[in-house]
């Protein structure tokens, strides 16, 4: 039933009465709100301060991440404030907790600048995480509408085009991070690259903190790496590469290093997450314009992504980075040395690889979302993995992944080339067994497949003997709220 003019006037008068009034009363809570296809949706895990009503806490987050301040301001009347206010429209208790709530908030798409992740995040996470009304706050998931997604370029190259360039289909890609990550000379660094690629890897990789230090300047590293790449490619007949880290202190220097990498023939460059969102988007645009693959190391992410009740779920970072336009991003291993619950990792991989996401609460996916025409982003599995885990890696991570064996290649007793060969033989044996219908994930059958392959591959046998007892059985801190799944790597 329509309201009378006098009733609408009274409501408006109450809303704009000078002073401090609850956020929910100011219009930031609307349980009857009908979500629009064009809305940006965010799901926050809210832990209200003792005595704070969860609905008011949700409304406060909605207000402070959109148009509100701590008191009523008359200049709201000069805007379409009823439209621009974010609306918290649903609050649910988090399963198996007593003080945490999932708050669903809708934002008008016009609140955000087109194609600017910096502007989107300035609102969504810019101010609310220090808000006194909540003792902890975590951004768990987002739905980005089709209309807003289309203002971002997405991955510069994408999974399909990368596979076409490498001529590798139906199998994970193999890589390794040069170790030690710091201290090598340029010549020795290039030798590591050559040995790894000659032994069967597709990629070598700079680590996140190798840029241009006194022991090895960036230009020296690029030249020796390309020498190793070219020699290995000529010897094997395969397209090879090494992720040349172009991260630097200024964008001018980033572009300088990127241009040099292109000039000397690299097919891929690398940046770190700590560069910042604007720098990442800029590098992605450059990579697409210059036809290079762009690898992103998620350096720094666990400072805000690991804790379950505060920060940003890495799933959201995956969405943001796919929008920004990176081609690769480290997304977890399940079985390695770094944080990784199986269901959470699967949710990250689906976010990067699927063209359409359906709601999947055990995977932590709360919203249905289409990726418009943005390309797929290749997940990278890195950190404490070795060839003895190959059956688990293939099972958990699938084909579209780069398996990065750093220590698991360079730590091989017979040398780097032997370590690379061990990984390649193990992978190809496991993929062959899978394609033939073997129950390769079985704890007896999977290891036996590797042992059989090792009968004709000495480096693989040596690796299996060396690392057979190595595992990282720790309970993950970030686990599904809707399913109990202990991390399994045995």
From Swiss-Prot:
GO terms for biological process: reductive pentose-phosphate cycle. Binds 1 Mg(2+) ion per subunit. Its cofactor is Mg(2+). Gene3D superfamilies: Ribulose bisphosphate carboxylase, large subunit, C-terminal domain, RuBisCO large subunit, N-terminal domain. Substrate binds at residues 127, 177, 181, 298, 330, 382. It is an enzyme of class 4 (lyase). It comes from the Eukaryota. Its EC number is 4.1.1.39. GO terms for molecular function: magnesium ion binding; monooxygenase activity; ribulose-bisphosphate carboxylase activity. Mg(2+) binds at residues 205, 207-208. Its main location: plastid. GO terms for cellular component: chloroplast. InterPro entries: RuBisCO (IPR033966), RuBisCo_large_chain_AS (IPR020878), RuBisCO_lsu_C (IPR000685), RuBisCO_lsu_C_sf (IPR036376), RuBisCO_lsu_fd_N (IPR017443), RuBisCO_lsu_N_sf (IPR036422), RuBisCO_lsuI (IPR020888). Keywords: Calvin cycle, Carbon dioxide fixation, Chloroplast, Lyase, Magnesium, Metal-binding, Monooxygenase, Oxidoreductase, Photorespiration, Photosynthesis, Plastid. CDD domains: RuBisCO_large_I. SUPFAM superfamilies: RuBisCo, C-terminal domain, RuBisCO, large subunit, small (N-terminal) domain. RuBisCO catalyzes two reactions: the carboxylation of D-ribulose 1,5-bisphosphate, the primary event in carbon dioxide fixation, as well as the oxidative fragmentation of the pentose substrate in the photorespiration process. Both reactions occur simultaneously and in competition at the same active site. Belongs to the RuBisCO large chain family. Type I subfamily. This is Ribulose bisphosphate carboxylase large chain. It comes from Phaeodactylum tricornutum (strain CCAP 1055/1). The lineage of its organism: Eukaryota, Sar, Stramenopiles, Ochrophyta, Bacillariophyta. The gene is rbcL.
């Amino acid at each position: 039933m329509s309201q009378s003019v006098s009733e609408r006037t009274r409501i408006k008068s109450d809303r704009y009465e000078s002073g401090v009034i609850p956020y929910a009363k100011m219009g930031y809570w609307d349980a009857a709100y009908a979500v629009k296809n064009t809305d940006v949706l965010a799901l926050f895990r809210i832990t209200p301060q003792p005595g704070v009503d969860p609905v008011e806490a949700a409304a406060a987050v909605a207000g402070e991440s959109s148009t509100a301040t701590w008191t009523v301001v008359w200049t709201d009347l000069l805007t379409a404030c009823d439209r621009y206010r974010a609306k918290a429209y649903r609050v649910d208790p988090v399963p198996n907790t007593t003080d945490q709530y999932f708050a669903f908030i809708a934002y008008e798409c016009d609140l955000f600048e087109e194609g600017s992740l910096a502007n989107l995040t300035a609102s969504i996470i810019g101010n609310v995480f220090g808000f006194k009304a909540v003792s902890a706050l975590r951004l768990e998931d987002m739905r980005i509408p089709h209309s807003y997604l289309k203002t971002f370029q997405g991955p510069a190259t994408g999974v399909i085009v990368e596979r076409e360039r490498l001529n590798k289909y139906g199998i994970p890609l193999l890589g390794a991070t040069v170790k030690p990550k710091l201290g090598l000379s340029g010549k020795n660094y290039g030798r590591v690259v050559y040995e790894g690629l000659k032994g069967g890897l597709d990629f070598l990789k700079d680590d996140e903190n190798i840029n241009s230090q006194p022991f090895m300047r960036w230009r020296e590293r690029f030249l020796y790496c390309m020498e190793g790449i070219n020699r290995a490619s000529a010897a094997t007949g395969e397209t090879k590469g090494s992720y040349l880290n172009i991260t630097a202190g200024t964008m001018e220097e980033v572009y300088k290093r990127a241009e040099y990498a292109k000039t000397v023939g690299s097919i891929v460059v690398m940046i770190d997450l700590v560069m910042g969102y604007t720098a990442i988007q800029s590098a992605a645009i450059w990579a697409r314009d210059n036809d290079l693959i762009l690898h992103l190391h998620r350096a720094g992410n666990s400072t805000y992504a690991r804790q379950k009740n505060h920060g940003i779920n890495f799933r959201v970072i995956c969405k943001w980075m796919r929008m920004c336009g990176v081609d690769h991003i480290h997304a977890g291993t399940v079985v390695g040395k770094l944080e990784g619950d199986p269901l959470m990792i699967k949710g990250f991989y689906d976010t990067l690889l699927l063209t359409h996401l359906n709601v999947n609460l055990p995977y932590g996916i709360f919203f249905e979302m289409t990726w418009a025409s943005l390309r797929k982003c290749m997940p990278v599995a890195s950190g404490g993995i070795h060839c003895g885990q190959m059956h688990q890696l293939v099972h958990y991570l699938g084909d579209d992944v780069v398996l990065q064996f750093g220590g698991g290649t360079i730590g091989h007793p017979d040398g780097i080339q032997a370590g690379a060969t061990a990984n390649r033989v193990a992978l190809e044996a496991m993929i062959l067994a899978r394609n033939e219908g073997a129950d390769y994930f079985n704890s007896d059958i999977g290891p036996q497949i590797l042992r059989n392959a090792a009968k004709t591959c000495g480096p693989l046998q040596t690796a299996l003997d060396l690392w057979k007892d190595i595992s990282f059985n720790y309970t993950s801190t970030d686990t599904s709220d809707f399913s109990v799944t202990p991390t399994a790597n045995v």
